[in-house]
Each structure stands twice: as structure tokens, then as C-alpha cells.
Amino acid sequence: MITNEYLQRVLADVQKNHPGEPEFLQAVEEIFESLQLVVPKHPEWEAAGLIERFVEPERIIMFRVPWVDDNGKVQVNRGYRVQFNSAIGPYKGGLRFHPSVNLSIVKFLGFEQILKNSLTTLPMGGGKGGSDFDPKGKSDAEVMRFCQSFITELYRHIGQFTDTPAGDIGVGAREIGFMYGQYKKIVDRFEGGVLTGKGLTYGGSLARTQATGYGICYFSDEVLHYHGKSFEGQTVVISGSGNVAQYAAEKCTELGGKVVAMSDSKGYIYDPNGINLDVLFDIKQKRRARISVYADEVAGAQYVEGCKNIWNVKCDIAMPCASQNEMDAEGAKAVIANGAFAVFE
């Protein structure tokens, strides 16, 4: 509960000015609860309207994205870029391509990105973007045409010293490559810092693909060691099977854990012998298939419909790596009931 009068007043204004945006309002309330410990020590913040500026994006860009599918029919999606805060550096945050993407979710993610980036101690601001385009089931040519159309509008708002988007759900090296190629053609120069997550052969960074998944495991390993534990011999459940989840599973396995379950939006797989990462990577990276294929190809593995049911699998450590807000109260209760002693997100 927020009891600070200044924060209460700002929150009321945010709720009035941003109706119908539950994800964004949730993020603001959560951050304000933490800020209650700090705000009373800095009365100058209220005089300067600092929190009011903190919760209002500097710029919101919304645009249509027309593209042609393989049947020659024009499709239209909506694109977003929320440039939230550039106080300490260029806007930085990923692009998400998923049917659930809307303005509230993009603002929610962009708002949290300000704080995430500031914690790195690097001079990066916060932003987020994306589209309600669904790359699943689309051909490479369709994804390419969409990405080219998307960046043809967004290019005028980004740059290596202005805004440097990256990947997120639905946006990997393939999509970043399509967008960067179109960006380079439009601006007629090689601008290596404008889109991060590129392939190594055209300006990408070593281990960028693995960074987020590895990062959660390195962080978790430090926490475990602080409590006299480690990944060694622990049974782990990881939700998701995208970029973050895949490399979290890889690093977790290297650190001695046994990943027994992973999921996608339709259901989850359970392999009591531990997920075979070679098979998983082949299915998800090369074939871009559903995770259910794993159960068809690996003896002893099972596929269960319903991705939320993954938290019913017995484990020592649970790692939500699919999307935001994915572990609700029921999921948390299930994780505890099934023996987990740690949750890392």
C-alpha cells in the first residue's frame, strides 16, 4: 500500500491520464511501493516534479505496418515505440513481436527498462517497442517483408546516439538482421550501434544471443551460493522455450542442474532424464517447430497441454523465462506445493 502523500497524488494522476492500461499501472504501483523508502529523504524531488516526469514517457510513436503475405494479400499490423527516458543516455530496450502487444504492455516494459538499464551503470536510457504481428507460422519471406515495412517507419526515430532497439519475444537475430539490412539501405551508411542483437558477421556482439539466459543463471548461482547451495544436483523447471529459456537451460545444465520441463504457449514437455538440449535447439532454432515435437522424438518424454500447468511439475528451482507476469498466485502455490525452494525470473 502506498502511504506517501506525494506518491499517492502522482499515482492518482497516472491512473487518470492512462486509463485502460492495467500492465503499465501495475508497474507504476509496484515501483512506487519501493520508492516510499526513498522519497521522504529527498523533498527536492517533489519541488522539481521528478516523479511526475519519471512516469511519463518522453515520446510515444504508434504507426501502421502494412505488408504483403505469400498469397499477395496486404496485411496491416500496428507498431509501437515508447521512448521513455533518456536522462543518462540513448533510449535502450527491445522490440517484441507478439499478438498480445499493445500500448499498455509496451509502456510497462519501457518503464521498467529505465531502472533495469540504470542498474548496469552504463549510460543507457529506457524504451521499448514492438508490434502485434505474430511471426509464428509465417514464412521467412513474410517475416522479412514485415520487418522491412516496420523499420521503414521506425528508422526516422532511432539511431546509435538516439535510440538503440534490441530483440525480445518474437525478435531474434533473423528479425534484427532483416530490420538492420533495411535500415542500412535507407540511411545509406553502416551504423553498427543502432540495432543490437545482430549476427557476428555484420556487427553483432559475441555471446549476445546467450546473454539474457546465461545472465539469469549466473545471478541465480550467486544467490544460491550465498545460501550455501548451488545448481549441482538440483531439478529445474524452466517456462518458455525461446531465446532466454533455451540458454538458461544450457547454462543451468553446465552448472550441474537437471532441467526436466520447458514450455511454449500451447503446453509443456516433461523429460525425467533431463532435457536433451541438442534436440531442443534443433526443434526451436532450425525447424522453428512447436515444443510438442520433442515428446515425439525423445523416448520417455511427455507433452502436456496447457503451458501454465508446468508449475505442477516437481522441482527444486523454478525459472519463469517466457514472458512478464506469467507466474500468478496459483502458479506460486503450485511451485511451493511441489517442493521448490527458489524461484528466479
Positions of PLM-derived features:
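Solvent-exposed alpha-helices and their adjacent loops that cap or buttress functional pockets
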Residues: V55-P57, D70-V74, G89, P123-G125, ...
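Short glycine/threonine-rich loop-to-helix capping motif typified by GTGT followed
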Residues: K136, R174-I176, N243-C252, A332-K333
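ADP-ribose/adenylate-binding Rossmann-like module
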Residues: D316-E345
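Generic beta-strand/beta-sheet core signal
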Residues: N77, S239, Y247, S263-S265, ...
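Glycine-rich phosphate/diphosphate-binding loop of Rossmann-like nucleotide-binding domains
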Residues: G199, G204-N312
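Fold-independent oxyanion-binding glycine-rich loops
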Residues: K136, G167-D168, Q182-Y183, K198, ...
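N-terminal ligand-binding/catalytic initiation module
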Residues: M1-L206
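Structural beta-strand/beta-sheet cores of well-ordered domains, especially the beta-sheet scaffolds
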Residues: R59-V65, R78, Q234, L255-K258, ...
